[in-house]
């Protein structure tokens, strides 16, 4: 089936890629805009001109009158960049809020796609950087390039204006904290990094709960429940808002959508019309016509919901099937189609840089890594993440030259699969580094593309040659153009996902390696469209873990795409604490920021202090701070990640693993962190509180700025903050200082689980971490 996937949500100013799934490169595809809201008048006030500070304003951006593409001056349906006569992939660039309805004509028939567009979130802002901030003498600067997520890190596109002694960029971006690079002479080595804050509300978030209730109850909340003779499916949105939202979760509107793949337009509209506030009700007997096969082939009814205030949140989904579709005693079976694998409940992850793990003498191969699996097992980890293992001319492996073959210096595919089997024998899952945003320019596909072979003309994205910052002297295919690349990565040109041939190729790559490994870490996930990742998530086995590299972390990569995300908020805060630029209590700021961004599940974050792209924490901030930072990652919700060598005292990012001269005490410290986390379910639960017992912790001797404390409870206990009961809890105390801290703790806490169940008195000496019960 070439259906284009679930309903999509976006806002004015943010385009959406739409594409057929499972594409046939030889097929013909054509998109058509069937319905759209009336185009915005020139005098309409856009959101970024109003500057709302209240997160729950009254203006909802309704659908309004509809119009077609021919009646508007702005082209909202932009064809993909290919040389094909048809348009398999298009980009919806909405100019007004409301509902857009599209049709895809494909070889297997026509398919309907809806896109809900919310009002423009962007706000006019001015970014100013003193000329003296750039690490280059002012007289030597003849141009400056801005590099940030809002231009996809494409250099030489956005240029600030020189105004007096400042470089000034006028732009419009959504509310939030934005990291901006100002690059003198387009050179990343001469960049100045600036943080710019745009005021405004955070995003609401939701999860979906389902139940089945009897119909015909006059006391029920909705007409469907009162008027239906028979059981009624109830889908409730559990909504939350950031602490600074200025409104109650009950004030948040929720829009429900029935998946167009599962119901005809009339049935979908009837079902959606039953929604009231934050609840959707559906008579169970209306679900019976959904059964189209057995449990494996029947998709059921997919119901989506999105919260909206001044900004919209991430879409959540539930799949429901009536009893005649599946074997169950309940009238309806409801599942989360995007739930993480059962084995991936807060797993501890160990990243190995595959070309230095054997140490400073032996070359690292799959066989040598396999011989060291007992060591990895001794650390108590659940997942082994290997940096790229495919053919590449580089040590780091991110310049792929063959997606079908492993790197010859590492070993054969058979040797790789032997390593995977050895890990499985040790109950360790293996995550594969999936690098499909780009290839090496030495890949035969790019070489044929650059040489003008027609079959490869659309394989890579092209752009204006004036944007080149590498002085490469690219082969020109059309009007002084060049291949597109991010940053100054001229050796890894971007693949063109507008091409169905490329999509087919890379989906086959996904299929091939999904049959071998247990998960994918998606390199440069932010460079690839949401639509493609949604297809990957629906395509791979349910027990395959998906981890995204999105910098900074973005909740929209969680809506039916990835299970785990790089927690860049905590990473940045931990480094600020280590450098002395923030107090230890700033750990709470990182969690608050994730909520503000719109992340619903704190367990969906990968917590880390370093990786193969970043400096070693210990080298930058010292041993004691490094221990404390690691302890934070192991005592918060989510998945702690240890980068190989972190536990041995390595101070070079990709240098040889320290086997014979490593820090054994530090290794034991990490083993103990893993042991305590495994033994204490509350350390893996979702609930974190920085008030209550945590606020009672008093530093009597030591530096209070270097000490933080937080409670770990089950998430429902955290939510019930007004309860008089004292639920089971653990109190975590972390000390980032070089010297021990003496702290007073609540009387009812008696044992330190991190120190061999040592008894706790009125006060406690904390070297690095204490976990109190």
Predicted feature locations:
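Aromatic-rich carbohydrate-binding modules that target alpha-glucans
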Residues: 120-175, 185-200, 262-277
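Substrate-binding/active-site clefts of carbohydrate-active enzymes
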Residues: 343, 355-358, 389-411, 416, ...
């Amino acid at each position: 089936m070439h259906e284009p996937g679930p309903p999509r949500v976006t806002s004015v100013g943010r385009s959406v890629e739409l594409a057929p799934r499972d594409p046939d490169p030889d097929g013909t595809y054509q998109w058509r805009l069937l319905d759209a809201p009336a185009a915005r008048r020139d005098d309409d006030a856009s959101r970024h001109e109003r500057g709302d500070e209240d997160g729950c304003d009254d203006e909802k951006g309704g659908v309004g009158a509809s119009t077609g593409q021919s009646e508007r001056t702005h082209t909202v349906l932009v064809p993909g960049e290919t040389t094909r006569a048809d348009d398999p992939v298009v980009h919806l660039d909405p100019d007004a809020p409301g509902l857009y309805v599209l049709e895809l004509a494909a070889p297997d028939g026509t398919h309907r796609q809806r896109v809900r567009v919310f009002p423009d979130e962007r706000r006019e802002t001015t970014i100013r950087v003193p000329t003296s901030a750039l690490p280059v003498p002012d007289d030597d600067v003849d141009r400056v390039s801005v590099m940030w997520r809002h231009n996809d890190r494409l250099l030489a596109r956005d240029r600030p204006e020189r105004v007096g002694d400042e470089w000034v960029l006028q732009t419009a971006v959504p509310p939030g904290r934005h990291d901006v690079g100002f690059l003198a002479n387009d050179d990343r080595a001469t960049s100045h990094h600036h943080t710019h804050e745009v005021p405004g509300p955070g995003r609401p978030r939701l999860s979906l709960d389902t139940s089945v209730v009897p119909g015909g109850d006059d006391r029920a909340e909705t007409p469907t429940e009162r008027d239906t003779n028979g059981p009624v499916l109830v889908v409730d949105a559990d909504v939350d808002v950031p602490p600074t939202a200025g409104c109650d979760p009950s004030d948040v509107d929720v829009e429900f959508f029935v998946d167009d793949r599962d119901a005809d337009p009339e049935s979908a509209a009837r079902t959606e019309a039953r929604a009231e506030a934050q609840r959707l009700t559906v008579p169970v007997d209306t679900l019976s016509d959904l059964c189209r096969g057995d449990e494996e082939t029947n998709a059921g009814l997919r119901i989506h919901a999105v919260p909206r205030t001044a900004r919209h949140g991430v879409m959540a989904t539930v799949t429901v099937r009536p009893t005649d579709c599946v074997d169950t005693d309940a009238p309806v079976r409801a599942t989360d189609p995007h739930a993480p694998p059962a084995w991936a409940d807060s797993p501890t992850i160990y990243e190995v840089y595959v070309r230095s793990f054997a140490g400073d003498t032996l070359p690292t191969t799959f066989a040598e890594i396999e011989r060291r699996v007992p060591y990895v097992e001794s650390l108590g980890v659940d997942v082994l993440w290997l940096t790229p293992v495919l053919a590449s001319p580089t040590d780091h492996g991110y310049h792929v030259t063959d997606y079908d073959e492993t790197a010859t210096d590492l070993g054969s595919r058979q040797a790789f699969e032997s390593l995977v089997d050895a890990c499985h024998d040790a109950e360790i899952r293996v995550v594969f580094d999936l690098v499909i945003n780009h290839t090496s320019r030495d890949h035969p596909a790019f070489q044929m593309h650059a040489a003008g072979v027609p079959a490869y003309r659309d394989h890579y994205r092209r752009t204006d040659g004036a944007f080149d910052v590498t002085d490469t002297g690219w082969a020109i295919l059309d009007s002084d153009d060049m291949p597109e690349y991010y940053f100054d990565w001229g050796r890894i040109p971007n693949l063109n996902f507008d091409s169905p041939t490329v999509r087919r190729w890379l989906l086959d790559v996904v299929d091939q390696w999904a049959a071998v490994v247990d998960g994918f870490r998606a390199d440069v996930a932010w460079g690839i469209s949401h639509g493609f990742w949604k297809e990957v998530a629906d395509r791979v086995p349910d027990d395959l873990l998906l981890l995204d590299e999105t910098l900074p972390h973005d909740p929209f990569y969680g809506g039916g795409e990835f299970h785990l995300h790089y927690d860049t908020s905590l990473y940045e805060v931990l480094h600020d604490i280590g450098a002395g630029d923030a107090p230890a209590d700033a750990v709470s700021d990182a969690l608050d920021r994730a909520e503000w961004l719109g992340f619903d599940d704190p367990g969906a974050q990968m917590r880390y202090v370093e990786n193969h792209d970043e400096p070693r924490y210990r080298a930058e901030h010292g041993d004691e701070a490094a221990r404390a930072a690691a302890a934070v990652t192991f005592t918060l919700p989510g998945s702690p990640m240890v980068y190989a060598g972190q536990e041995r005292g390595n101070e070079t990012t990709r240098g040889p693993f320290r086997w014979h001269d490593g820090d054994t005490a530090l290794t034991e410290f990490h083993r103990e962190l893993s042991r305590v986390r495994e033994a204490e379910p509350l350390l893996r639960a979702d609930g974190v509180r920085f008030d209550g017992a945590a606020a009672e912790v008093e530093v009597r001797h030591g530096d209070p700025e270097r000490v933080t404390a937080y409670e770990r409870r089950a998430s429902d206990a955290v939510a019930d903050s007004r309860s008089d009961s004292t639920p089971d809890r653990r109190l975590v105390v972390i000390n980032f200082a070089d010297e021990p801290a003496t702290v007073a703790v609540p009387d009812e806490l008696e044992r330190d689980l991190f120190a061999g169940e040592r008894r706790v008195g009125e006060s406690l000496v904390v070297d690095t971490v204490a976990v109190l019960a």
